[in-house]
Amino acid sequence: MPEPTKSAPAPKKGSKKAVTKAQKKDGKKRKRSRKESYSVYVYKVLKQVHPDTGISSKAMGIMNSFVNDIFERIAGEASRLAHYNKRSTITSREIQTAVRLLLPGELAKHAVSEGTKAVTKYTSSK
């Protein structure tokens, strides 16, 4: 009686690992689609603030969602401000005003000062 052929073990139910590269019919390997995220930048800031602290992938996902949400809110508000003033360009002034409108009190002040510092650093490096 012939032995049953051994195949690769089936992936566990609920396995989160995706197949890295799937084989196409013509033998070429398909590239994995790239997911854009802010995780690299969140990690860099975390290491500046707390060098000995790590972050879980779930927490990183939450931080990524948070940054995307704040970005969309600021961009939307800045767009509205530009439209109200019959402007077709969003400048740092619209962004600054949007931040002042969206963020509460002291948080807005700190965000504006950090933003101004970043813009100054960027323009001086050009």
Curated annotation (Swiss-Prot):
Transmembrane segments annotated in the record for this chain: none
Residues recorded with modification N6-methyllysine: K47, K109
Main location group: nucleus
Record SMART domains: H2B
Record PTM N6-acetyllysine, positions in chain: K6, K12, K13, K16, K17, K21, K24, K86
Modified positions (N6-methylated lysine) in chain numbering: K117
N6-succinyllysine PTM sites in chain numbering: K35, K117, K121
Modified residues annotated as N6-butyryllysine in this record: K6, K21
Modification type N6,N6-dimethyllysine: residues: K58
Residue numbers bearing the N6-(beta-hydroxybutyryl)lysine modification: K6, K12, K17, K21, K35, K86, K117, K121
Region feature (Disordered): 1-36
Residues with the N6-glutaryllysine modification: K17, K35, K44, K47, K109, K117, K121
Residues modified by glycosylation: S113
SUPFAM superfamilies named among the record's database cross-references: Histone-fold (SSF47113)
Task performed by this protein: Core component of nucleosome. Nucleosomes wrap and compact DNA into chromatin, limiting DNA accessibility to the cellular machineries which require DNA as a template. Histones thereby play a central role in transcription regulation, DNA repair, DNA replication and chromosomal stability. DNA accessibility is regulated via a complex set of post-translational modifications of histones, also called histone code, and nucleosome remodeling.
This protein's name: Histone H2B type 1-D
